């Protein structure tokens, strides 16, 4: 397996198909990417007329860890607590494809040279598809930030886009990964405590509906993603199964007498063409359906995180009200309690205002994306079904027409 791969503008799939309606004053894209063993280097190109930047067009080279650093910087910034932070791109993972190629290279005496070449071609195509999707997901993350009227003004985002040197960001060690896992557990427990034992009542029907909807939506999206992956893998397995069938028929075509030779060769060609068609079906389903579901599973989690932050702010506001009542009853430290209550109130109202707009934008974005991807997938599957029918019909006609 080659440890070096490169993709340019023409080679990127629109695997998430996120609808980005930002203005043209800040345009970001990944113009090139190179894979070197376990690292992928992305060339991030920026075009902007914003006064903050010294130039109107520039590019930098970034690695995955720097994308994660940027995402974490947004999540940890209190100013963005009322916003849906775009989900971080997944870590590049080519290990499975490399292991398959390594096993194939170790050799199997039962595999013919023709079968080996076809299987190697399939695995290399799979590796390239994963690489292109990795690039596309990193690009979508940056474009979501660039299109957002608030997130695009972040200082760290400017540094990420413009600073020409390495950002000296390292990957998280095991202790930090464990810490993040424990924080998620604490957050889940805190949310359950707020909504359950404390008996906190939601004061806005809009957010109560959104919370109920997102809990169900996230579960359904996750289940649909698992099912879509199973269907896609079934198509891939079918395409792989056609390889030995085609090879066996081709071998028979070279051994039999003239009367059967033509039939075997035509059948071998049939299964080879069906193999390529099934491969395209699997690729389209992976790109248009599985990847979209996987992306919105992460995006819906980001929306759930936003609702948790607002719920936490509401709980803090309620606790501040109780503390103020106690202070007034005791007639002690009333002014600090009033000041704290006002701050909690302002934070809760600020988060509520921005969260409502963010959730409405999330709805329109996902509806547009689902409509676009599902229509395109249906059109592609109709095209492939017609092509498959035509191949079978032409093969039958050719076989019947033989002397």
UniProtKB/Swiss-Prot annotation:
Q: Which InterPro entries match?
A: AH/BAR_dom_sf, PX_dom, PX_dom_sf, SNX5/SNX6/SNX32, Vps5_C
Q: Name one GO cellular component term.
A: cytosol
Q: Does the keyword Transport apply?
A: yes
Q: Name one GO molecular function term.
A: phosphatidylinositol binding
Q: Which domain of life is it from?
A: Eukaryota
Q: Does the keyword rRNA processing apply?
A: no
Q: Which residues form the PX domain?
A: 20-168
Instruction: Tell me which UniProt keywords the record has, alphabetically.
Output: Coiled coil, Protein transport, Transport
GO BP annotations of the record are:
protein transport; regulation of macroautophagy; retrograde transport, endosome to Golgi
Q: Which residues form a coiled coil?
A: 258-335
Q: Which Pfam families does the record match to this protein?
A: PX (PF00787), Vps5 (PF09325)
Membrane-spanning parts: none
Q: What's this chain's function?
A: May be involved in several stages of intracellular trafficking.
Q: Which family does it belong to?
A: Belongs to the sorting nexin family.
Listed name of the protein: Sorting nexin-32
Originating organism: Homo sapiens
